Amino acid sequence: MNTAAIDQTNARSLDSTTASMVDPFGRAVTYLRVSVTDRCDFRCTYCMAEHMTFLPKKDLLTLEELHRLCSAFIAKGVRKLRLTGGEPLVRKNIMFLIRELGKEIEAGRLDELTLTTNGSQLSKFAAELVDCGVRRINVSLDTLDPDKFRQITRWGELTKVLEGIDAALAAGLKVKINAVALKDFNDAEIPELMRWAHGRGMDLTLIETMPMGEVDEDRTDHYLPLSEMRKRLEADFTLKDMSYRTGGPARYVDVLETGGRLGLITPMTHNFCESCNRVRLTCTGTLYMCLGQNDAADLRSALRATEDDAYLAQVIDDAISRKPKGHDFIIDREHNRPAVARHMSVTGG
């Protein structure tokens, strides 16, 4: 890890705490993704090994520390904040953090607070999420087949997730379904998954699998370029490119036959680096400037070194100055090691 070597005594004036974040390529950083835990109640085959060794709980930032870090980024121009994991809703007392961040929306300092979830805890938390100011969530769901769902999640129960989605919709949350497109696993189901989602007023976003972390399977066996998936869909559906954006990497098409939107996230075949507006913070206070690179900044040390937010802001600025132009993801038989050693559950997607 490349830790910012900055003398605390040379911290800039308080003006640095509100200076906007612009990387070396002129891209404004306005989107923060925060992995609040690396733990999850599922073990999805493309995300983590079945017998994961998780971070010791003593290494995690407290919820109060995560709140302070998030507030520092909001002060520096972040307008959208997404909580991820692992599974964010399994973190003990997570609603404290969500409620505190919701106050930033009330104050006009944050435009959107959202989260990505596997749906297993939504029946319990959906109504409270709305009360805290969350209006939109992403739910990861790769198949509607109970047996395949158990196979890919290893531990998950499809019924529980579907009940959670129903609870979210009933509470008034806008739900988007995220599905990783996997060759010879769920690719034949994508049309039906799309009809199901659109029929319930939900967008569907397809995602290419990414080479992150050691897992128990060879990713090349299931890698499916979304350019190929789109061609298959166009045999039965009329897909019209849209300018619609949500602030993330998805490119959207309108599906005329269903009246819904289909998003495509293509880090492998058509990366989204040129418009990247985001950085990722882990539950240990590590800031990754790029999903597909290993360079990182240690914000935990800066956070705990002083109560002076000007020093923390300077460490953040130093990290943003190292944000790379793009990633180097490759999936093929010659590159069977992951491009990035850390698991997606650590980085938060």
Swiss-Prot record:
Stored SUPFAM superfamilies: Radical SAM enzymes
Enzyme type, top EC level: lyase
Binding site for GTP: 33, 82, 116, 176, 278-280
Cofactor note: Binds 2 [4Fe-4S] clusters. Binds 1 [4Fe-4S] cluster coordinated with 3 cysteines and an exchangeable S-adenosyl-L-methionine and 1 [4Fe-4S] cluster coordinated with 3 cysteines and the GTP-derived substrate.
Cofactor(s) needed: [4Fe-4S] cluster
UniProt KW Coiled coil keyword: no
Keywords, ordered alphabetically: 4Fe-4S, GTP-binding, Iron, Iron-sulfur, Lyase, Metal-binding, Molybdenum cofactor biosynthesis, Nucleotide-binding, S-adenosyl-L-methionine
Radical SAM core domain residues: 24-249
Catalytic activity reported: GTP + AH2 + S-adenosyl-L-methionine = (8S)-3',8-cyclo-7,8-dihydroguanosine 5'-triphosphate + 5'-deoxyadenosine + L-methionine + A + H(+)
EC number(s) stated in the UniProt entry for this protein: 4.1.99.22
Record has Phosphoprotein as a keyword: no
Biological processes annotated in GO: Mo-molybdopterin cofactor biosynthetic process
Binding site for S-adenosyl-L-methionine: 46, 86, 140, 210
Family: Belongs to the radical SAM superfamily. MoaA family.
Protein's job: Catalyzes the cyclization of GTP to (8S)-3',8-cyclo-7,8-dihydroguanosine 5'-triphosphate.
Subunit structure, interactors included: Monomer and homodimer.
Stated name of the protein: GTP 3',8-cyclase
